[in-house]
């Protein structure tokens, strides 16, 4: 349920944005700042960067114990918000909690998963990541008819689930991999042989190549995905000429397809067939999906828009984000696995914030087709990088992968 509440908070904000704008009379700048500092962008980036370091220094369970309390505080500010500072503060605090939570949960899932079923276990987080938005959108379609109070209720249901998840986490043990790595580190410290981890460690040698590879796969792809997440209702209605109700149905349908794709494609096939081939297919259909929007508006037909929703939904559930979660956990050693994931997630969300600011200006100055061409280019780059550079890690333990890549255990 971790990914459910994390992704749900992003979509709940987008679904109620117009209601909050009417209630608070927000200016364009205030709305832009809200989007840029939300859990879909900058605040989550900072949360991931800080959370990753804490995860490696104090343990996965340490972050797990406290990050949802931060999340709940932010949610309470939103639910009871009566002015812009409360709303903005709530968004920022929620984002910090989401960023730290994503890193801790994705790292822990991979470390505790059996080697032969790692993709299946990692896919469970992606399943919840798609389920959360689908449920939130359905709730919003019904509750938003009651105005802003409806959106407050949507946020409130996430508080209840977060509190339940936090209570369940108190019973969880620490990661065995992290515990073993920490004990070894403490032994080396006593012997004066330990090498401190810094970001310079991650930005040199094989680690730098891995960071660049993961950014090529995920950061570039996320420019497309963040456009989908924030602007698709607008695009469906203003470019695709769909009604608001049909647009909402398309959005819900895409998330339903996403969690079905996660379960039936990534979780079932990610450990049983070539990941390079699977990535190549799923990444390729994403390029085709976005190519639809480069066509003149009068050429667009309903079957094309449905094809876009299906292809994009399949990719969102079993494509770049799922592989990023898996590879980021596999390709770095336990000693700084969470720090590395926090760094790449930070880069991804910061660039998403910059891109989110740029998209409206690009559409206003050059038209949406030009923006769509850029998005197709981003999707193609991500597809090629992942297909060419896909590591062969299927069925191997994290320790095996570490020794193959570094030539020794990283202590």
Roles of regions detected by a PLM:
Residues 13-14, 207-259:
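Extracytoplasmic gate region of multi-pass secondary transporters
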Residues 14-46:
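Extracellular/periplasmic helix-loop-helix junction of adjacent transmembrane segments
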Residues 46-82:
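Conserved MFS/SLC helix-loop-helix module at the cytosolic interface between two early adjacent transmembrane helices
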Residues 48-59, 261-274:
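Helix-to-loop junctions at the C-terminal end of transmembrane segments
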Residues 59, 80-85, 114, 296-299:
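Helix-breaking motifs and short loop linkers at transmembrane-helix boundaries and internal kinks
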Residues 62-76, 277-292:
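Structural signature of the two symmetry-related core transmembrane helices
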Residues 90-127:
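Cytoplasmic helix-loop-helix junction between adjacent transmembrane helices
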Residues 119-144, 161, 345-355:
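Glycine-rich segments within core transmembrane alpha-helices of 12-TM secondary carriers
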